[in-house]
Every structure is written in structure tokens, then in C-alpha cells.
């Protein structure tokens, strides 16, 4: 189980990303439209004023049950430990253990 502070920090980041997403899109479009390099630098300076945690690259996928940040499966939103447990108890529909 991950520390609650890490899970809360990730929730905060997710909220910031959603909040500043529209502003980031506008700035990116302005950079594409800008013709000179100086204009691009000025717009880039505006984007640097935004909070650091509002960048989507700072988000990490976490397990929805345990909060574990490593070894997550995108399809399920679970870490490998929880995925294995739930697959063995038939809690995940359509998931079967392979054998050959």
C-alpha cells in the first residue's frame, strides 16, 4: 500500500493538469502560429509561468486499489499483484489464466 500522502499528491497533480489543460493548448497553438523565433520565445516564457505540476508529463499511473505506482496495467488500472489476485478469484470478467 502506498503512502496516503503520495496518493493525495497525485490527485492534486491530476486536478492541476485538468485545470491548466486549456491554457496549455492555447499556448501550444500560438507557438505553432508564431512566425519568428522571438515570438516563440515570448510565448514559451508564458508557459513557464504555469505551475510545474500542471504539466501532464508529471502524472503517474497508480493502482486504483493500492496506490502502487510501478507495474500498472493500463487496461485495468491495477498493479500486477492486485491483477493476479483478482484474476485468480474470477473478479475480472473475461480474464483467464493461460496454459499451454
Curated annotation (Swiss-Prot):
Task: Describe, as the record does, how this protein assembles with itself and its partners.
Answer: Part of the 30S ribosomal subunit.
Its main subcellular localisation, reduced to a broad class, is plastid
Q: Supply the alphabetized keyword list.
A: Chloroplast, Plastid, Ribonucleoprotein, Ribosomal protein, RNA-binding, rRNA-binding
Q: Which GO BP terms, alphabetically?
A: translation
Name the domain of life this protein comes from.
Answer: Eukaryota
Q: Name one GO molecular function term.
A: structural constituent of ribosome
Look up keyword Zinc and say if it applies: no
Q: Sum up the protein's function in the record's words.
A: Binds 16S rRNA, required for the assembly of 30S particles.
| InterPro entries, alphabetized | Ribosomal_uS14, Ribosomal_uS14_bac/plastid, Ribosomal_uS14_CS
Q: Which Gene3D superfamilies match?
A: 1.10.287.1480
Secreted as a keyword of this entry, yes or no, is no
List localization entries.
Plastid, Chloroplast
**Pfam families for the chain:** Ribosomal_S14
What name does the UniProt record give this protein?
Small ribosomal subunit protein uS14c
Gene name, Swiss-Prot/TrEMBL: rps14
Q: Which GO terms describe its cellular component?
A: chloroplast; small ribosomal subunit
The entry sums up its family as follows: Belongs to the universal ribosomal protein uS14 family.
Amino acid at each position: 500500500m502506498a503512502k496516503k500522502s503520495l496518493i493525495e499528491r497525485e490527485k492534486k497533480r491530476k486536478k492541476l493538469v485538468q485545470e491548466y489543460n486549456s491554457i496549455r493548448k492555447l499556448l501550444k497553438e500560438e507557438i505553432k502560429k508564431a512566425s519568428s523565433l522571438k515570438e516563440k520565445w515570448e510565448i514559451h516564457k508564458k508557459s513557464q509561468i504555469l505551475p510545474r505540476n500542471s504539466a501532464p508529463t508529471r502524472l503517474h499511473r497508480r493502482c486504483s486499489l493500492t496506490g502502487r505506482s510501478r507495474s500498472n496495467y493500463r487496461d485495468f488500472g491495477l498493479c500486477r499483484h492486485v491483477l493476479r489476485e483478482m484474476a485468480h478469484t474470477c473478479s475480472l470478467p473475461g480474464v483467464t489464466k493461460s496454459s499451454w
